[in-house]
UniProtKB/Swiss-Prot annotation:
HAMAP family assigned to the protein according to its UniProt record, in alphabetical order: CobD_CbiB (MF_00024)
Pfam family, any one: CobD_Cbib
Gene Ontology terms: cellular component: plasma membrane
GO MF entries: ABC-type vitamin B12 transporter activity; threonine-phosphate decarboxylase activity
Taxonomic source organism: Klebsiella pneumoniae subsp. pneumoniae (strain ATCC 700721 / MGH 78578)
Keywords, comma-separated and alphabetical: Cell membrane, Cobalamin biosynthesis, Membrane, Transmembrane, Transmembrane helix
Role noted for this protein: Converts cobyric acid to cobinamide by the addition of aminopropanol on the F carboxylic group.
Transmembrane residue ranges: 56-76, 78-98, 153-173, 204-224, 296-316
Protein name: Cobalamin biosynthesis protein CobD
Subcellular localization, as worded in the UniProt entry: Cell membrane
Family according to the record: Belongs to the CobD/CbiB family.
Topology relative to the membrane: Multi-pass membrane protein
Associated pathway: Cofactor biosynthesis; adenosylcobalamin biosynthesis
InterPro entries: Cobalamin_biosynth_CobD/CbiB
């Protein structure tokens, strides 16, 4: 039943994703983080105090998320096994973000294909932290491909990985780790101290999933009739071409698969950030590379699901 729950949750993510008005745990986690951050800032004033407070905030958010998820699941199973199974499916479904990611990427690609640069920039600003107001089509394409590649780890592979390690409650706890990083894990002066623990522990949580993405995306490239060998080579060669210890693994692999160049300088919070280039410009990046990256994401996602189901079946059987 557990493995069936995994498959049903994954299919639900593929088919319906995250309808905007449905209740979603990540929104609740986000509200908890916002309240916790206000409390920490009210109490802590020096950088040292903010770092400590940020660490306490991390423990509170992760602990509450895991505890509530475990408690709700245990209560549902206690009422009826089928209710417990349905709650498990719902938790796993909400931990995955494949369709949401694909829809967000195509929301940028469609106006770009129609020549509406302003609308494309606007939609891009919803999913990236960089300044999008002056971006040209090639830069927009690059930003979307990078976002889809990076979030293949955050939104699919890592949740499935933690689902394997500790079931739905640990997958939900991972979503809290990721949400903390997305809300406070910035190098900007406002967040550097309070978000230090969140940023570093997000790096720790994604360490193995990011490296798995190198293999999964390379195999996906073969299955999608992209250049799998170049994906494997470039992913390994450029794995450190990023300030994050994890982001370059999926980005470089996708860049190699498609024969394009990612990375480079960008503006964040009004500051110019120089980043190294990733991949080789075998050809110019194009808007079609967005849909090709989404295809790689879906195939890598299905491979990750199959891999983790296989590992769990080998360890404990079909239970």
């Amino acid at each position: 039943m557990t493995l069936l729950a995994w498959c049903v949750a994954w299919i639900l993510d593929v088919v319906i994703g995250d309808p905007p008005h449905w209740p979603h745990p990540v929104r609740w986690i986000g509200r908890l983080i916002a309240v916790s951050q206000r409390v920490v800032r009210r109490i802590c004033h020096s950088d040292r105090a903010l770092r400590i407070g940020g660490g306490v905030m991390w423990l509170v958010v992760i602990g509450l998320t895991w505890g509530v998820a475990w408690g709700v699941l245990a209560l549902a199973h206690g009422i009826h096994p089928w209710l417990g199974w349905l709650v498990e499916v719902w938790m796993i479904f909400t931990a995955l973000a494949g369709r949401c990611l694909a829809q967000s990427a195509m929301a940028v690609a469609r106006p770009l294909q129609a020549g509406d640069l302003a609308e494309s920039r606007h939609k891009l600003s919803w999913i990236v932290g960089r300044d999008t107001s002056q971006l040209q089509p090639a830069q927009i394409n690059r930003a979307v491909v990078e976002t889809v590649a990076e979030n293949t780890v955050d939104g699919i592979i890592a949740p499935l990985f933690f689902l394997l390690l500790g079931g739905a409650p640990l997958a939900m706890a991972y979503k809290a780790v990721n949400t903390l990083d997305s809300m406070v894990g910035y190098k900007h002066e406002k967040y550097r101290a309070i978000g230090m623990v969140s940023a570093r522990l997000d790096d720790v949580a994604n360490f193995l999933p990011a490296r798995l993405s190198w293999l999964l995306l390379s195999l996906a490239a073969v299955l999608c009739r992209e250049d799998g060998a170049r994906a494997l080579r470039t992913g390994w060669r450029d794995r450190y071409q990023h300030s994050s210890p994890n982001c370059a693994w999926p980005e470089a692999t996708v860049a190699g698969a498609l024969g394009i160049r990612l990375g480079g300088p960008n503006d964040y919070f009004g500051q110019r950030v120089e980043k190294p280039w990733i991949g080789d410009a075998v050809r110019d990046i194009a808007v079609d590379d967005i849909s090709r990256t989404i295809r790689l994401m879906w195939v890598a996602s299905s491979l990750a699901l199959a891999l983790f189901i296989g590992v769990r079946y080998w360890l404990v059987g079909a239970a």
